[in-house]
UniProtKB/Swiss-Prot annotation:
Function: May function as a large pore-forming protein.
Keyword Lipid metabolism included in the entry's annotation: no
Modifications the protein undergoes after translation, according to the UniProt entry: Contains 2 disulfide bonds.
Tissue: Expressed by the venom apparatus.
Keyword hit for Membrane: yes
Compartment(s) where it occurs, according to its Swiss-Prot or TrEMBL record: Secreted; Target cell membrane
Modification Histidine amide, positions: 284
Signal sequence, renumbered to the chain: 1-17
Entry GO CC: extracellular region; membrane; other organism cell membrane
Keywords: Amidation, Disulfide bond, Membrane, Secreted, Signal, Target cell membrane, Target membrane, Toxin
Similarity remark: Belongs to the megalysin family.
Protein name from the UniProt record: U-megalopygitoxin(8)-Mo12
GO MF: toxin activity
Length: 287
């Protein structure tokens, strides 16, 4: 099968945009596969996501202290805060978590011929006959995905998948949620038009064998979560002439040597049948 006919598209729609991934393999060589992806999911960081980045209250205060020279008494990543909500009052940006797909690549593929179905035709008459027949069999194309640990990320994006393999007559589409594992399938008939003709002498028989290539492809998609915005901090007794400060979260992460990103991997496996053909052979296996 010429894999240039395999196309994978992935779409996830959110308030802030969506994920789009297009796969197009230029021939049988994996190194020629081209995968394009765009999109993002942006949201104010959730409390449970703080642990994923190692910015719970204690480590965050320690890191802010390394920026300013003194550990603050209070620290916030989003509103509301105490004392009139500093984010609103000073128009400071809350800390947001941005998730984007950063890599998608084919990590494995396999193609192997197999017998899908067979049928024996016998001439039970006392004269020579011509046998005309067609053979077909229903097979199942599949798509399944698995996720690595989502590391406590709170992503509510819906994802719409579309998989097409032209030579395999495969077209599977469905909508899911980010982080949800699914297995989808479709039944297709192979060999529908695979007719044959054979002349049989009295008592002779032939076997019609329908074969196809069973293919599979594995694609890894890596999503990366990063942070933006500022930490609002308070010193009860003031520090360097002020009580309130806003430090960029990236600066704080660097100062505290905190985690700068969280990666999540999705593995997609596609299974399909292609290149069906019929072989007619006698009882000795001769074609």
């Amino acid at each position: 099968m010429n894999l240039q006919y395999l196309i994978l598209s992935l779409l996830s729609t959110t308030v802030y945009g969506g994920f789009n991934l297009n796969f197009d393999s230029k021939g049988d060589a994996l190194e020629k596969a081209a995968i394009d992806f765009t999109g993002e999911d942006v949201a104010v960081i959730k409390e449970n996501e703080r642990e994923s980045f190692g910015i719970t209250d204690g480590p965050l205060k320690d890191a802010c202290g390394k920026v300013s020279g003194r550990r603050p008494d209070h620290v916030w990543l989003y509103k509301p805060t105490l004392w009139g909500d500093m984010y609103t009052m000073y128009k400071w940006p809350e800390v947001t978590r941005t998730l984007t797909p950063i890599a998608a690549r084919v990590v494995g593929k396999e193609q192997k011929p197999m017998i899908v179905s067979s049928q024996v035709y016998r001439n039970r008459s006392n004269r020579t006959v011509k046998v005309n027949g067609k053979i077909s069999q229903e097979v199942t194309n599949t798509v399944e995905n698995k996720w690595s640990k989502t590391h406590g990320l709170s992503v509510t994006a819906s994802m719409t998948y579309s998989f097409k393999v032209v030579e395999a007559s495969m077209e599977i589409g469905y909508t899911s949620e980010w982080g949800q594992e699914e297995t989808k399938s479709e039944s297709v008939a192979v060999g529908q038009e695979m007719g044959f003709e054979s002349e049989l002498q009295p008592g002779e028989s032939v076997e019609a064998v329908l074969s196809a290539t069973k293919g599979s492809m594995i694609i890894d998609v890596t999503y990366r979560a990063t942070l933006d915005g500022c930490c609002a901090i308070n010193y009860n007794n003031g520090w360097k002439g002020h009580h309130y400060y806003c430090y960029p979260i990236g600066m704080v992460q660097d100062a505290g040597k905190l985690k700068k990103h969280v990666d999540v991997k999705e593995t997609i496996k596609i299974g399909f049948y292609s290149d069906s053909h019929v072989i007619v052979r006698d009882k000795h296996g001769k074609k």
